[in-house]
Curated annotation (Swiss-Prot):
Assembly and binders: Forms a ternary complex with MCM helicase and DNA. Component of the archaeal exosome complex.
GO cellular component, one term: exosome (RNase complex)
Gene Ontology MF terms in the entry: DNA-directed RNA polymerase activity; metal ion binding; poly(A) binding
Region (Disordered): 279-300
SMART domains linked to this entry: TOPRIM
Protein name: DNA primase DnaG
EC assignment: 2.7.7.101
Family: Belongs to the archaeal DnaG primase family.
Disulfide bonds: none
Annotated GO biological process: DNA replication, synthesis of primer
Cofactor binding comment, as recorded: Binds two Mg(2+) per subunit.
Domain called Toprim: residue spans: 172-248
Binding, Mg(2+) 2: D222, D224
Amino acid sequence: MGALTIVAKYMIVAQIEVNGSVDKSDIIGALFSQTEGLLGKDMDLRELQMMGRIGRIEVDIFEKNSKTKAKIYIPSNLDRYETALVAALIESIERVGPYLANIKVLEIKDLREEKRRRIIEKAKELVKMIEEEILPDTKEIIEKLKEDVAKAEIVEYGPEKLPAGPDVEKSDSVIIVEGRADVVNLVKHGYRNVIAIEGISRGIPQTVIDLSKKKSVTVFIDGDKGGELVLRELLKVAHIDYIARAPPGKEVEQLTAKEIAKALRNKVTLEEWLAQQKAAGEKTEAPAQPTQQQPPPAEAPIQFPFDMSKKVEEMLGTLEAEIYDANWGLVKKLPVRELPDFLTGEGDSFYAIVMDGIVTQRIVDLAAKKGVKVIVTARVGPLTKVPEDMKIITFEKLTQKVA
């Protein structure tokens, strides 16, 4: 069907069969000539076409042998009654040239309905485009705005000028992460008491170590081996209260607000984390085991001047430490949290420490400098080096040995 020459409301579709071989022009000529004057001048096809009431008549011949079959398309700008009258008019055609003919109207299409359908379909496409293209762009703009605001709030903290959130100084707790991008992501989502160590290649910054002495500390690590390495280094020198971890394979800087909230909500204490590692086969501690040489210290005979099993019962749950001299005289009793500071201070050397806490690499290093030879403890954290002349034994192994 060719292009319409008017803005039509309706389309008359008819089929014609001619008992002979004819052309398009023959069929169109028959339509005009055989309907002329039948319904008066106002309904004459030629007059209607000249006034733009009907459009260009199209004929598509689809069979032409001894008989000719074709479809006729007549666009109409008349109202529905007049259009129906024109349709009935063309059915009155009986001949095309010398051949008998028969015309049957197949349908009268409401082109406005077709147009409405196309408009609706187009509207659906546009809505889909809005959802897929415009809305994501809006979200991206909002995320970019949040990130820019977060970056503007990042401060440089301490002599090392570590990237940190604006509330690190005044908050009672602090979240330690690895890098600046992690800080930006957490600040963007409302966590303003966060500070980064900026990697572990140059060691843990003293600023972070000092913060860990006076604030509740949560270490938020990536969900990969790199995160475990960061935690291992922190445990050597800093006081760690809680550990939060990103989902496996994800980094803290990549997390959404929901993922951050879930990870921090599911944080565990250091004791719980160590127990989980032990239950999982102590995978993160396995590489350090050969250098710890813990079995020999645990099995080596240690002479105590008092019933150590009773002492263990007394200390369980107190989170305290007791410092002894070479004659097993009590020098100091203090909370385990204050033990590193006490060992750092100036003073005489000591012989033994009994503590209801976790022995970290930092405690081992400080105790070694004070000449400590025996440490009796509730738990042993990840250690990389223990002096050969230092004996470390856990409450559990001690009670088993006594039993």
